[in-house]
Amino acid sequence: MREKSYDVVIIGSGAGGGAVAKELAPLAAAGKRIAVLEWGPKLAESEYTGRELEMAKKLYVDSGGFITAERTMTLAFGRAYGGSTVVYTGTSLIIPRATIEKWRVPGLDWEDVARRSRAYMAENNVHLLDDEQLNENNRLFAAGCEKLGYRVEQFPINVKGCKGSSLCNLGCPNAAKQGTHRVQLPRAEAAGVEVVTNCKVERLGDRECIATVRNPGFGEPSAWEPGEYRVRAKAIVVAASAVGSPALLLRSRLPVRLPALGRYFTAHPALILVGEHPRPIRSFYGHPKSFYCDHFAASDGFLLETCMYFPFVTAKNLAGFGKEHSELMRRMNRMQMILVLALDPALPDNRVTVDRAGEPVVHYRFTPTVLRSLVASMRASARIFFAAGASRVHAPAADRFFIDAADAARVDELITLEHLKLGKLSITSAHLMGGCRMGAGPADSVTDAWGQVHGVPWLFVADSSLVPACAEINPYITIMALADRVAQRVRERAGELLAS
């Protein structure tokens, strides 16, 4: 086993790990040894082909189909230089004040999170897209919402030079998306931070990581030779995702008891819904996610967003199979799509564990409230589709494959909880949160408000697993803001932590 030694090791390079790497870059420039260990590959620009199955295999854990223990929801999260920011659509929102107040984390206040969020939005070139970049799918959603009186807003997006290829979720082929792979990581590397790709951290010991390097046969080879490594560090920052970070800590021999570790996992359970129009819809050009509707967030517990996915993902997310399924897929060029997100509660039994091999297992049970939110979201989406001119709608909790426009007034009657069958419809999630939640103490949390693991002064967490309860928005910028706080605490304690 080879040996390496650093002052700080950061595990993961996504929104959290990338932000920490950039914020600790001044320490590297001053001579401290800092490394980012990333499980995934760094692809060459020519490898961003936009081919759905190829890119899913290269950039996602389990090709985007990591399934829960109950087999009722699949989880999509990235594994790459840049983490999930490589495959994210770039929507960037500041978390609502009310959400932070509901979290009730001592030492965490909204003004601080908002200030840091605004700084990262500026750094990532977040802005509203011009009208010509808003494709027809997005325009139809906005028009339908406005016709019905539903509040609708445009998403700020983190792009520079967007060419409207609509391939955001497969990795931007035009180098336009300003994820950590484009912004924070290159700046960190320029200051002397080492980034080691294809490096999976298996477990932690006392101020050390045990890691394995394997090159997958695509992307750039790792900076380290393939093999096993013991990596010693004076401080370790874990930013391996809401699935990976709890699993890593559970595999490790920590010197403290943390009963909340892995628990309080939330996910914004999502459905991809489609309406068919009587004419082709120009939806595969322009940014795929330009508008959102939070009209029902407080009353019914869900958000609606525009989306446009690819043939395999779309086919997987339609309920049923056979003639009607094939008929709808043949008319994919007439589809309007809406993504619905349920705002789920943080429950101790929704959790990440590890199996006998140490691999993560996510346990997630849907509450009656979340199921009712999904039904309500399908009804609202059907109304938007019909208001926008759709001739028929496919809703997974209806008593039929298609609801025709003639029955538009009957959506409440046709889409019901009775017809929502878990395991018979495709529920997905890409907003994975919790498992190493922040809080006051070890009884019901894993870290303090600055990401330090309770009772372990050299160990920090800096990713979406910190989120103590549902973020109620797309959490990307919030993750960066929380990670920025973690980096600040490491810098402030550098004299103590990094003393030789």
Model-derived features: positions:
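A conserved short coil-to-beta-strand element within the FAD-binding core of flavoproteins
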Residues: 156-157, 197-208, 212-217
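Short beta-strand to alpha-helix junction loop
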Residues: 129-137, 169-187, 196-198
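N-terminal FAD cofactor-binding segment of flavoenzymes
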Residues: 32, 39-95, 138-144
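FAD cofactor-binding and catalytic pocket of flavoenzymes
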Residues: 106, 258-383, 420-421, 429-434, ...
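Glycine-rich loop(s) and the adjacent beta-strand/alpha-helix scaffold that form part
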Residues: 23-28, 33, 40-45, 190, ...
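A glycine-rich dinucleotide-binding beta-alpha-beta segment and adjacent secondary-structure elements
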Residues: 164, 168, 205, 391-469, ...
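N-terminal Rossmann-like FAD-binding beta1-loop-alpha1 element of flavoenzymes
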Residues: 8-36
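Rossmann-like flavin
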Residues: 81, 85-162, 365
